[in-house]
Amino acid sequence: MKNSENDYIQSLFQILPGLLTAFLVACLSKFLAIWLPSLGAATIAILLGIFLGNTFVRGANLNRGTKVAESKLLEFSVVLLGTTVTFQTIAQIGLQGVAFILIQMSLTIIFAYLIGKKLAFSDNMSLLMAGGNAVCGSSAIASIAPAIQADEEEKGQIITLVNLLGTVLMLTLPILSGILYGTNLLARSALIGGTLQSVGQVVASANMVNENAVQLAMLFKIMRIVLLVAVVYLFGRFKQSKTAESEAELVEVTKKSSALPWYVVGFFIACVFNSLIHFPVVISETAHFFSSWFEITALAAIGLRLDFKKFFQEGKRFLIYGLSVGTVQVVLAILLLALLQF
C-alpha cells in the first residue's frame, strides 16, 4: 500500500512542473488577450508556448506534465464541448451551409490523405492530418489517434503540423475573405468556420472580422465538431479493414466492435442530451468556461512541446505537406462557396 502511495506521489511530482507551466502560460495568454483581443487567448497560448518552449522554458522535467496537459485536457475539452452543441443549432446555417460543410470535410479528408500518401507518409499520419484539418484540429487528432492505433510520435508530429498550419491560416483568412467577399458576412464566416482547424483559431480569426462573424463562423465549426464521432468511427473501420486485408483477417476483424474513445462517446452523449432537454444556461456556461481553460492550457502545452529543431529535422516533406493541404483546403472552400452561391 505504501509503495503504491509513494508511486502516486512521485508520479504527481513528475507531472506538476509541466502542467503548472502550461497553466501559467494559459493564464498569461488570457491576460494578454485583454490587450490583444484580435488574436485571442487560444492563439496567444500557442504562439507564446512555441516561443517559450524554444527559448527559455526548456527541460526534460516538463515533458511529462505538458504531455498530460496536451492529451488529457483536450479529452475533457472534447466532452465539455458537447454540452454547448445542439442538433437544433445546425439548422441555423441552413441546408446550404450543411451541404458546404459535408462536401468540404469529405474533400479535405480525401485530398489530405492522398497528398500524404503521395509524399510517402504513413496511413496513420495521413489519416491524422486529414481528420485534424477536416474536423477540429488537436481535439480531432486526440480522438482519432487511439481509434487507428497511432503512436505518440505520429500524433505529436501531426499536431505540430496542424497547429502551425492553423496559426498561419488564422492570421491570413480574415484578410483573404475580406478581399474575396467584402461585406458578405455569411461567406466570410463560412470560409473561416469551414476551414480553420481548432475552435480557438476560428474564434480568434472571426474576431478579426467582427463579433457577428464569430457567431456565424462558430455555427459552421459546430457542424464539423458534431461530425467528429462519425469521422473517428469511419477512420477506425478504414484502418481495421486495411490491417485485416494485409493480414488476410478481414472477416475476423469485422466481427469485432469498434470501441470509440470515452471522450468521443461523452461528447456525443452530451450533445444528444443538450439537443433533447437543453442544459440550463449555468451548466452550459460552466462547461464552456472549463472547456475554454482546458483547451487554452492544452494549446499552451502543445506550443511548449513544439520543438522547431525536431520539426526541421523532418525535412521539407512536412512543410510541403502542410502547405499543400492548407492550399487545397482553402481553394476547395472558395470554389464550393461560389458553386453554392453564398
Swiss-Prot record:
Keyword Transmembrane: yes
Disulfide bond sites: none
Keywords, ordered alphabetically: Cell membrane, Membrane, Transmembrane, Transmembrane helix
Coiled-coil annotated residue ranges, if any: none
The protein's name in its UniProt record: UPF0324 membrane protein EF_0922
Membrane topology category: Multi-pass membrane protein
Matching InterPro entries: UPF0324_pro
Bilayer-crossing regions: 13-35, 40-62, 93-115, 125-147, 159-181, 213-235, 262-284, 289-306, 318-340
Family membership noted in the UniProt record: Belongs to the UPF0324 family.
GO CC, one annotated term: plasma membrane
